[in-house]
Amino acid sequence: MANKTVLFNKHLESNAKMVDFHGWDMPLNYGSQIEEHHAVRQDAGMFDVSHMTVVDVTGTDACAFLRKLLANDVAKLKVPGKALYGGMLDDNAGIIDDLITYYLTDTFYRVVVNSATREKDLAWIAKQSQGFDVTVTERPELAMIAVQGPNAKAKAAAVFSSEQNAAIEGMKPFFGKQAGSLFIATTGYTGEVGYEIIVPETEAEALWQALLDQGVKPCGLGARDTLRLEAGMNLYGLDMDETINPLAANMGWTIAWEPTDRDFIGRKALEALRDAGTDKLVGLVMEEKGVLRHDMPVFFTDAAGVEQQGVITSGTFSPTLGYSIAMARVPNSIGDTAEVEMRKKRVAVRVVAPNFVRNGKQAF
């Protein structure tokens, strides 16, 4: 029996096509994935992300524990509400999950992890917390709605109370704040501005309906995937997993190497990988007809004249750009051109940074 979010009936009311997503019944689209994609790039769309796992870490050792658990360093978070993105690694520097951590007080952090990895994440966090004065509390009674797009903040403001709007006024990107019953964060998975709103399940349907009434378009997993890929954002299980280290997943920027005495889990293995050199995650652009897809092989000739091979991790047609884009894991020696094998022939592609669209505009 699949899990259903508290918004399941609202999806059916909007004629959603429901699919299984890691054991959850989730909307794939509400009629047109392309229209939903464009709504987020040009106006405002919303996603039910209540399947995500919210975990509160509290206690006198909360900071020390998270400094061990995560490759990024929560000690950098000085202002209440500030968040950071990073990887939770195993001893071999494989990525157990990627997650966002909010600093609320010195003894209270909120962590949002992926739904597909929920059970192994919770088990790993519980195991690693032994010996620390912390309490790890999953918050299944909380739902989450992401409102994204150039008009998302204005449309959400019409739904929030005057007190909530005052509480979040001027909030910078990558912050979260408790405003009444809502935890409102300036985060997202689309490359657009907007909010991710953590809401009690008892209030989620009313919030969804209020946003609908403001003209916010409901969007499904299909648009969520094309939007995140245009934005160059990794999807766990495709672009990285426990066999991949963050240096090979375009997550090097999320590793806090300093201070050198912070012994986070996976550090020694990661230092060895850094010194030896790893593959890297790049962007591919193909302006010919056709669509780049997961697992297609990528070929290029390096400076020494040797043919090298990589693989596409995520690929799609980009509705914003009008042609196909992909992320690919390739040897570090790649230049700015390559070939992808599709339908038994090789097609030329451009190699770019894995960031295709930001705030509705081409980013490369």
From Swiss-Prot:
Gene3D superfamilies: Aminomethyltransferase beta-barrel domains, Aminomethyltransferase fragment, Probable tRNA modification gtpase trme, domain 1
SUPFAM superfamilies: Aminomethyltransferase beta-barrel domain (SSF101790), Folate-binding domain (SSF103025)
Top EC class, one word: transferase
Keyword Glycosyltransferase belongs to the record: no
Protein name: Aminomethyltransferase
Originating organism: Shewanella sp. (strain MR-7)
Role noted for this protein: The glycine cleavage system catalyzes the degradation of glycine.
InterPro entries on file: GCS_T (IPR006223), GCS_T_bac (IPR022903), GCST_C (IPR013977), GCV_T_N (IPR006222), GcvT/YgfZ/DmdA (IPR028896), GcvT/YgfZ_C (IPR029043), TrmE/GcvT_dom1 (IPR027266)
Gene Ontology MF terms in the entry: aminomethyltransferase activity; transaminase activity
